[in-house]
């Protein structure tokens, strides 16, 4: 299976939107569902109302996190969301409303690493995706410092936040769980955690062939697959 550089990942996204007529909310829904299913497989519920924290950023990766939180609530978990930089976009506002109507709490302040360890089963990093470049700015610089110190499982969506999409970041957060969306990015070569899933079962065959992705078979009707 071939891993994607940043420009290839961006090109595939644009082709899905422009040539294959997918909408942003369609792909976000499919991606977020695959994140939620993969988390439920890697970390099955051991009781009722297990608490999870989803940290969402201002872009589409953050939207994937909001969708995942909604599905995780439907799966019987109790997600809470930290979403400090909300863009004024109808899609994101709708996702927030959906979560609020499902009684998912939005936190005003980020808990400390110690508080997270005590309160939550795991934390989902849905802050930055493959389009991120440059320095991490406030408030997310402090968020990543906190996430680097948590002892509970950290679950990264597509690209661990703060990592170079191609080179990774040995000094950054080190998630236990990574779900690559569409196809793994080159930085996934530096992932040393326990669970690496591929999610987003929506890439048309013609696009798979064009980019020579050779993705593994998805089991049954699952939207995700555990990579070896």
From Swiss-Prot:
Q: Which PROSITE patterns does this one have?
A: YJEF_N
Fetch the Gene3D superfamilies from UniProt: YjeF N-terminal domain
Binding sites annotated in the UniProt record for K(+)? 61, 125, 161
The protein's matches in InterPro entries, at most eight in alphabetical order, are given as:
YjeF_N_dom, YjeF_N_dom_sf, YJEFN_prot_NAXE-like
Every YjeF N-terminal domain range: 9-214
Q: What EC number(s) is this enzyme filed under?
A: 5.1.99.6
Name the family the entry cites: Belongs to the NnrE/AIBP family.
Return the protein name: NAD(P)H-hydrate epimerase
């Amino acid at each position: 299976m071939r891993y994607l550089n940043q420009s290839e990942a961006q090109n595939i996204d644009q082709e899905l939107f422009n040539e294959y007529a997918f909408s942003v909310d369609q792909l976000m829904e499919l991606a977020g569902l695959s994140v939620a299913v993969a988390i439920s497989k890697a970390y099955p519920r051991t009781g009722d109302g297990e608490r999870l924290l989803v940290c969402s950023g201002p872009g589409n990766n953050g939207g994937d996190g909001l969708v995942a939180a909604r599905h995780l609530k439907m799966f019987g978990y109790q997600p809470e969301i930290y979403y400090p930089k909300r863009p004024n976009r109808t899609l994101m506002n709708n996702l927030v409303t959906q979560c609020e109507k499902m009684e998912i709490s939005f936190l005003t302040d980020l808990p400390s690493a110690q508080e997270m360890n005590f309160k939550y089963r795991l934390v989902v990093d849905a802050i930055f995706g493959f389009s991120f470049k440059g320095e991490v700015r406030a408030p997310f610089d402090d968020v990543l410092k906190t996430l680097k110190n948590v002892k509970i499982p950290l679950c990264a969506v597509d690209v661990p936040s703060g990592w170079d999409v191609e080179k990774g970041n040995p000094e950054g957060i080190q998630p236990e769980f990574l779900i690559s969306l569409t196809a793994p990015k080159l930085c996934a070569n530096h992932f040393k955690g326990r669970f690496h899933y591929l999610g987003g079962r929506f890439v048309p065959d013609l696009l798979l062939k064009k980019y020579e992705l050779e993705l593994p078979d998805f089991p049954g009707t699952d939207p995700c697959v555990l990579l070896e």
